[in-house]
Amino acid sequence: SDAEVMRFCQAFMTELYRHIGPDTDVPAGDIGTGAREIGYMFGQYKKIMNEYTGVLTGKSLSYGGSLARKEATGYGLCYFTNELLREHGMSFDGMTTVISGSGNVAIYACEKAQTLGAKVVALSDSNGYIYDRDGIKLDVVKQIKEVERGRISEYAKRVPGSVYTEGCSGIWSIKCDIALPCATQNEIC
């Protein structure tokens, strides 16, 4: 329940607050942790420390969070990659791109890569990956992942010509010009 999540977050911060701070370590939300949980932890930190400081990222706007926080990591990855490509006389434009993951980083990396002209053909989750040779329809992915909180396999049921494959590692065998690992740590061995 919401109350249990709140109590857990508050208890966690009661132990964590000594080890973090705006000049020490600034934790952020991660898989399964969003603005709600960060808000609970930030509220507890404020209560304990009597400070309203930048000690956690991923807060809601009402707690001083950033407007584009949700998009920041995925967009940043693409801006950084685009600069690397530019140094070598290339860009995302026309590049076939594979992206692992389908959370915030992957979804917004996909969005920005497409905006920069890439053709993103694959995304994954912890169960498998989708391949769409015509290019991922991001509106469908956002509906499944952000609204319905569903699995990426749903995409293949809704988009004709796309394919879902169980298991995640196969995504790296898809022929592409650019591969962006956005799922979790240690995914490329």
Regions found by a protein language model. Name each.
Residues 165-189:
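Long hydrophobic segments that form regular secondary structure
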Residues 38, 106, 187-189:
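Short, well-ordered alpha-helical microsegments
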Residues 15-24, 45-52, 127-130, 147-162, ...:
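Short secondary-structure junctions and interdomain/linker hinges
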Residues 33, 105, 185:
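Glycine-/small-residue-rich active-site loops that bind phosphorylated ligands and cofactors
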Residues 27, 98, 178-181:
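Short catalytic-loop micro-motif centered on adjacent basic/acidic residues
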Residues 1-93:
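Glycine/serine-rich phosphate-binding loop and adjoining beta1-alpha1 elements at the start
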Residues 57, 65-170:
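Glycine-rich phosphate/diphosphate-binding loop of Rossmann-like nucleotide-binding domains
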